[in-house]
Regions:
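A late C-terminal transmembrane helix in Major Facilitator Superfamily
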Residues: 120-159, 163-164
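Helix-to-loop junctions at the C-terminal end of transmembrane segments
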Residues: 55-68, 152-153
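Multi-pass alpha-helical transporter architecture, strongest
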Residues: 165-188
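Residue-level signature of mid-helix packing/kink "hotspots" within the transmembrane helices
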Residues: 50-58, 141-142
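Juxtamembrane helix-start elements in MFS-like secondary transporters
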Residues: 37-46, 92, 96, 126-130
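Intracellular helix-loop hinge segments at the cytoplasmic ends of transmembrane helices
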Residues: 29, 111-121, 134
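Extracytoplasmic gate region of multi-pass secondary transporters
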Residues: 5-47, 51
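C-terminal transmembrane helical hairpin of 12-TM major facilitator-type secondary transporters
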Residues: 69-114
Length: 188
């Protein structure tokens, strides 16, 4: 708990999960209002999202075997790319299908990536790190969803992707900060 790398990894976990849930928690509402989709179409979008997500978890598991940090960073780029695509594509139907597929792919392994990344910073206390990963992930869900709701009330659901973007930048910066600390330790 005293290792700076562990604390930074915990913050990354929180920011990553908060990023994804600030928009995903309002998935149906977002597609209804911002993309002008009816409820039946939204159901199909959820199906696409889920199917792609199953594939993404398999891919993420394979990638984790090669590099936990690179895998986490790869999937975190979705917190930057997906919000930009969602915001700037208005209600283009077929483009939205592709974006929802990408969203499902980048989002679905988020708990796997966040907890594995966090645990990798404390290999001597894996059980403890795992329990904190779950707790901070749940905190990220709560805070991301709450702030997403506040954005909806103040500005509208179409602006929730910007919250995802901001939390994503914070999560990526935590990975960079941890890398700097680890490089300093190895050079000393």
């Amino acid at each position: 708990l005293k290792k700076p790398e562990f604390i930074i990894s915990t913050a990354m976990n929180f920011f990553m999960i908060a990023a994804w849930f600030s928009t995903y928690s309002y998935f149906a509402d977002y597609l209804n209002r911002a993309k002008n989709m009816d409820n039946t179409t939204v159901s199909y979008m959820l199906f696409i999202f889920g199917i792609v997500g199953v594939v993404a978890n398999f891919v993420a598991g394979k990638m984790m075997n090669k590099s936990v940090t690179k895998t986490t960073l790869f999937f975190l780029t979705g917190t930057i790319i997906v919000p930009l695509l969602l915001y700037y594509t208005t209600d283009m139907f077929f483009t939205t299908i592709i974006i929802v597929g990408l969203w499902g792919f980048m989002y679905s392994p988020s708990f796997l990536n966040a907890s594995t990344y966090m645990i990798s910073s404390a290999p001597e206390a894996m059980e403890f790190a795992n329990s904190l990963a779950t707790s901070f992930g749940n905190l990220g869900v709560s805070i991301g969803t709450t702030l997403g709701g506040i954005i909806i009330i103040k500005y509208g659901v179409e602006f929730t992707p910007w919250l995802t973007f901001i939390f994503g930048i914070l999560a990526i910066s935590m990975i960079g900060l941890r890398a700097i600390l680890e490089n300093k330790k190895h050079s000393n």
